[in-house]
Every structure is written in C-alpha cells, then in structure tokens.
C-alpha cells in the first residue's frame, strides 16, 4: 500500500514540478507542502480509522496553551474567562477534546465536593468560540498525538522553528511525537541534529536542495520519493499509536532503564 501511495505522490509531484506550472507558484503559496499534507492523509487514514470514528486526522488548529482573563476579580468568581491559545499544524493525528470550566466555592465550603459538572451538549460554531451556559464555559480543541510538519525543503532557520514548536507541544502533551517531512534537505554537515527537539526528520527524496531554476536543466536528476523512507515513517507513527504510554518509574526499574526507547 505504501508503494502505491508513493507512486501516486510521485506522479502528482512530477506534474506540478513541470516548469510552466511550477513558475506560477512561489514558496509562499504552500502548494507543494500541501501536496505532502494530502499524501500523509492517504498514508495514515486506514491506520487511524482502525481506532474508531472519534480519531482526528488531517490539518488542525490545535491546543497550545490556556490562560484566564477575567475583567475583574468579582467576575472571576462568576466564571473563569478561560481562553485557549491554538496553533496551526500541517498534519496531525490526535483527538478532539471538549472541556467545561466553572467557578466554584472552595472545597471546604462546597456541600457536594464530589459532584460532577454536567457537560454542555451544544458545540460552539467553531473552535475559536466558547459556549457559555450560566456560569459554565465549554471549550472544544484538538490535541495532537502525532504532529507532522510538511516542507518542500528544510534549512537551519526552519529547523530551529520546528524545534521550538516541538518543545512547546511536548511541554503540554509529553506523549506526543513531532516529525518533519520534506522532499529536499538544505542543511550543512556541521548542524548537530541532537540539540533539536524534533523526534525525526524525513527527506523523502534523499537529496540536497538546489535552487529551483537548476531543477529545470536537462542534466538535473531528481531522485524519486524513496518507498523505504515512507515505510519508516509509517512504521514509526504506527508504533507510537499502538504503544502503551502508561509506563513509569516502576516499569523502568524492572527494565533497568527508566526512559523507554
């Protein structure tokens, strides 16, 4: 299956890479990176579908942080005024979460400390809004378990940005996996990849980047997308999705090493 999807990607990209088409779009158009996003959807859709209809796959506006902005203290006692900061990701596998917040009396004053808050069933029109019912706020947002950044090529500045995004994601969701996928690489050999926070970098064509005009020369050889690289990506994501994340100190002691690999 991975080979069939790879072949479809290669055919589609060869069509778009023709000079009379490619010159109509610059790097800001995101045309070529969006092709990779679509490729990832078809690569993983059956795998993710096996987890059920609630599984999230595709481009997503995901949870980044939460903060509280009541206009004054007396209002904070009525409801929390929570705000969810979000971040765009090219491709994610994850879950959509609905949470409710409400202001409550301190535990020692609460006559029913074990009472559960009833979730509001009405969903906001979009993920940037909050549903307020009485003093209860309901928020909906996506949590990525796998986040994949799609690039035509990757240089050092881009890698630094990817590393910061990976660090932010893992601070909120330590069980997440952050991957960067590109066609070409534009990094020199003196770059130390171990200092960056991304979990893996995939170069689909296993080829250094060249300026676009050189790719139109007759003697330029463009490597095909390597199916072995695609398989490695697929198996890495599959392993992460099917691994038990509940390990801890006790299981680590039994192994003898605390951080599982």
Q: What does each of the following model-derived ranges do?
A:
Residues 19-118:
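Acidic-basic catalytic patches of nuclease active cores, encompassing PD-(D/E)XK
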Residues 1-5:
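Short, small-residue-biased leader/transition segments that mark boundaries at the very start
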Residues 95-97, 151-154:
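Short, flexible loop/turn elements at secondary-structure junctions
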Residues 101-104, 153-164, 171, 189:
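Active-site-adjacent loop/helix micro-motif of nuclease/hydrolase catalytic cores
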Residues 91, 144-152, 162:
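Conserved catalytic cores of phosphodiester-cleaving nucleases, focusing on short active-site segments
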Residues 148-153, 180-184:
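Short His-Asn-centered micro-motif
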Residues 95, 114-142:
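Active-site-proximal segments of catalytic enzyme domains
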Residues 165-172, 179-261:
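Domain-level recognition of nuclease-like catalytic cores that cleave nucleotide substrates
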């Amino acid at each position: 299956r991975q080979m069939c999807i790879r072949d479809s990607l290669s055919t589609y990209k060869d069509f778009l890479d023709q000079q009379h088409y490619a010159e109509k779009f610059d790097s800001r158009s995101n045309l070529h990176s969006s092709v990779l996003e679509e490729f990832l959807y078809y690569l993983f859709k059956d795998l993710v579908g096996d987890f059920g209809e609630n599984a999230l796959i595709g481009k997503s506006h995901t949870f980044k942080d939460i903060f509280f902005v009541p206009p004054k203290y007396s209002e904070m006692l009525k409801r929390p005024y929570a705000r969810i900061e979000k971040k765009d990701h090219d491709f994610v596998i994850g879950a959509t979460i609905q949470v409710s917040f409400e202001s409550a009396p301190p535990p020692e004053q609460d006559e029913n400390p074990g009472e559960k808050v009833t979730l509001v069933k009405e969903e906001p029109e979009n993920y940037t809004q909050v549903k307020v019912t009485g003093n209860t706020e309901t928020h909906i947002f996506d949590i990525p378990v796998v986040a994949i950044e799609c690039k035509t090529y990757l240089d050092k500045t881009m890698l630094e940005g990817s590393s910061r995004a990976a660090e932010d994601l893992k601070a909120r969701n330590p069980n997440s996996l952050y991957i960067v996928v590109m066609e070409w690489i534009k990094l020199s050999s003196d770059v130390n990849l171990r200092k960056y926070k991304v979990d893996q970098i995939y170069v689909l064509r296993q080829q250094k980047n060249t300026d676009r005009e050189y790719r139109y020369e007759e003697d330029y050889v463009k490597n095909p997308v390597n199916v072995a690289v695609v398989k490695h990506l697929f198996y890495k994501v599959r392993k992460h999705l099917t691994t038990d994340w509940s390990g801890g100190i006790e299981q680590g002691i039994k192994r003898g090493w605390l951080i599982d690999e």
